[in-house]
Amino acid sequence: MKILVVNCGSSSLKYQLIDMTSEEALAKGLVERIGIEGSILTQKVNGEKYIIEEPMKDHKKAIELVLKALVDKEHGVISDMSEIAAVGHRVVHGGEKYASSVLIDDEVMKALEDCVKLAPLHNPPNIIGINACRELMPKTPMVAVFDTAFHQTLPDYAYMYPLPYELYEQNGIRKYGFHGTSHRYVSSVASEMMGKDLKDLKVITCHLGNGASLCAVKEGKSVETSMGFTPLAGLAMGTRCGDIDPAILLFMERELKMSPDEVDTVINKKSGVLGISGVSSDFRDIEGAAEEGNKRAKLALDVYHYTVRQTIGAYTAVLNGVDAIVFTAGLGENSAASREEILNGLEYLGIKIDAEKNKQRGKQIEISTEDSKVKVFVIPTDEELMIARDTKEITAK
């Protein structure tokens, strides 16, 4: 059984064709600059690159070229489109309606449209991608896998904001959380590595990329997470501010005469470690600058590590203890220095790190010592595989 996994952005599209017998990706690809001059599709099969450069006016044209690349006689991996048993779509926001992945039909599409107001940047391209696939592959079942779904198990006191209750009732203003597919995947792998049932464990998962969030997992369920109504909340990130005093936004508008759009640009695109360092949103650049004596770069890293450490401490309280901490995503998987700094100060939990093991980059590994009371893992995330597994399970029913 082969499943196509699609992740549509506003001008890009990532895809993988996964053989579910071996759970291996037969092909991985990226389409860039959709609707912009210089559109390009890059597909990788067994390390070999295949590139298509031609105009792609919309996502439908992009998906046409994806299917063309997959069945290409020389560079493709399937002989016919009928080999694609189902398509799994990453959808950022499922609102309160969806606590798990779902088979797509017209009713689901309407619900996704209703969620656009909650994710105006992300849901529209997700919907466009689904519509294009449904048009080009009308007989192939489609499944929506939501970033928010895993966090629908948060208790009401964890997701409710202390605002007038009517704002929740009438406008859906509450904590939703994101990166759910990643948190779900790495927590399940951690339990496998420990040889225990996830339902018997308390796990804190740290998805640390340009966007970053933490999740507290208890009895296999998300009970707390750092992102909120939007992916702006929580930790300091690459370009996002994370949690700040909300009155700062009013100050920016009233005193600095900034428009709501200007404020939005500042808190979403000009803040985080980029804003503090003035160097970059790329942690490799900031680490390099800090090593060369750039004080603002060092401060940016200190603030970032502090917000992660602070949140791990809070989630240990939420869980009433912790059995395992997992690092994943770009920074979590690849920066030994950041992992060390984040855990520095959590010795009271009985965490002991093996310095040699911690030097490993991008590999699935336990980095805690044998006598560490809390297991610490680095687990490369695989959201595409999780989407494919959900798609297989739902279409098999």
Curated annotation (Swiss-Prot):
Family: Belongs to the acetokinase family.
Location in or out of the cell: Cytoplasm
UniProt cross-references to PROSITE patterns, sorted A to Z: ACETATE_KINASE_1 (PS01075), ACETATE_KINASE_2 (PS01076)
Cofactor(s) the protein requires to work: Mg(2+); Mn(2+)
Pathway(s) annotated for this protein in UniProt: Metabolic intermediate biosynthesis; acetyl-CoA biosynthesis; acetyl-CoA from acetate: step 1/2
Task performed by this protein: Catalyzes the formation of acetyl phosphate from acetate and ATP. Can also catalyze the reverse reaction.
Binding site for ATP: 14, 207-211, 282-284, 330-334
Keyword Chaperone: no
Complex and partners: Homodimer.
Gene Ontology molecular function: any one: ATP binding
Reactions this protein catalyses: acetate + ATP = acetyl phosphate + ADP
Protein name: Acetate kinase
Cofactor comment text: Mg(2+). Can also accept Mn(2+).
Name of the gene this protein is made from: ackA
Site description Transition state stabilizer, residues in chain: 179, 240
Tagged with keyword Kinase: yes
Highest taxon, organism lineage: Bacteria
Residues binding substrate, per UniProt: 90
Enzyme Commission (EC) number: 2.7.2.1
Binding, Mg(2+): 7, 383
GO CC annotation terms, alphabetical: cytoplasm
